[in-house]
Amino acid sequence: MYRKALLGSTRLDILSYISSMEEDREIVEEVIECLIAHVKGLIHSKLIPEEEGEKILKALEELRASKEALFSIEAEDIHEAIEIYLKEKLGKTGGYLPLGRSRNDHVVCALRLKAKKALVEEIGLILELRKALIKKAEENVYTLMPLFTHLQPAQPSTFAHYLSAIIEELEDITKILFSGLGIVDKSSLGAGAIGGTSVLLDRGYMGGILFSDIITNSLYATSSRTFLLYSCFLSVLISIALSRIAEDFVIFSTPNFGYIKLPNEHLSTSSMMPQKKNPVTMEVARAWAGEAIGHLVAMMSILKALPSGYNLDMQEVNKHAFALFSGTIKTLKIFVDAMKRVEVNKENMKKDCDIFPILATDYAEKIAMNTGRPYREVYMEVASIIGEHESTEKIYSELSSKYGISISLEEGIKKPVVGSPNPEDVLEFLEKAKKNVEKDEKKLEELRQNENRDNVYNP
């Protein structure tokens, strides 16, 4: 359609090579929303006859319910397909639509809407995950477990303390996601192809239908994908955090550890070995983080060193962004379900606390403080005693005999510093965590209410 007057038709194989129609399935809803805002802006500024504008709005609203019809049209992209559709449906009236509009400002508008919706959904799912973690932590404040460095038993803790670390990380990620929305939630409508338009559009009015602000500079509005890279980076950040939890859960669910039992729906068996219970959802989540990083690297590789202004290279970025949003949201849903229903084996956790000399640091610190001797000197003595014995019981027995002190696991977790596994500290943290969830839920609800703007045509 666009090329006909200047270039004539092209071959189908070439059209297929440059077309983004399949990828545009992901943003067809957002493209229509942007067009509705644009037409409302044209009517508002009295740039087209109101009656004709209302016909276009009605047709666009009807198109929302029958979007699949667009994908039988031969077109470079969804924007061209919609214009072809409107021309066939409305005749000349459809020709009012593109006044003051370019695909360049409209694809950015659609991508920003898509990214905004993805961030909002990610925040909502992270809030669900935080609530599930808090509930599970409250049930396990006194559930002893070893913590690990280098995957070696390190110090005594509780399962609640372990989960609290995840909760606090997700709180920080939530803050970053809210911050990201401030960057994404801006309108490009009215920026034209690159240098604006001579049509006197009210950019603030159009932008206010879908966004909370506008991008001022028309070149930046149409040719930058920083907003998309940033929102995709946030999806990668989430995915990496989840992959580390997934790795822990894969390890903790093995018979060798036996700390947790994942829901049966999250497990798969072997085609040959009837005893196998494989933690497949966690394995896929672990792999997804690698894929997510790959998508982000592909996006950055495409965008780096592009000249200013729109280039069709940018079209190739979109499929990676869509995959990132979709994959991260799916993975979050898996974790919400798994965390709600995971079972904890307190006996196995406690058993490993007894088997390994994870109180060694507590002994060394207490001896140093009791005697006033340099810690490194005491550390060396404790390490030597550990090296002489295979049995944890014998290690503790000699330390107690030699230095006249005895430390239990329960004492070992009751450390005086803030943020330790001390049950009092953990309970206090969990109370704050619940309040933080409530604050973030309120913030998200306010954001969703603000998004419930009248961007739907009501004849």
Swiss-Prot record:
Q: Name one Pfam family in it.
A: Lyase_1
Q: Name one GO biological process term.
A: arginine biosynthetic process via ornithine
One CC-aspect GO term: cytosol
Ranges where the record places region Disordered = 440-459
Output the superkingdom of the source species: Archaea
Q: Which InterPro entries match?
A: Argininosuccinate_lyase, Fumarase/histidase_N, Fumarate_lyase_fam, Fumarate_lyase_N, L-Aspartase-like
Q: Which reaction does it catalyse?
A: 2-(N(omega)-L-arginino)succinate = fumarate + L-arginine
GO MF terms on file? argininosuccinate lyase activity
Arranged from A to Z, the UniProt key words for this protein are: Amino-acid biosynthesis, Arginine biosynthesis, Cytoplasm, Lyase
Subcellular location per the Swiss-Prot or TrEMBL entry: Cytoplasm
User: Which SUPFAM superfamilies does this UniProt record tie to the protein?
Assistant: L-aspartase-like
Enzyme Commission numbers on file: 4.3.2.1
Query: What pathway or pathways are given for this protein in its record?
Result: Amino-acid biosynthesis; L-arginine biosynthesis; L-arginine from L-ornithine and carbamoyl phosphate: step 3/3
Q: Which family does it belong to?
A: Belongs to the lyase 1 family. Argininosuccinate lyase subfamily.
Quote the protein name from its UniProt record.
Argininosuccinate lyase
**UniProt organism field:** Pyrococcus furiosus (strain ATCC 43587 / DSM 3638 / JCM 8422 / Vc1)
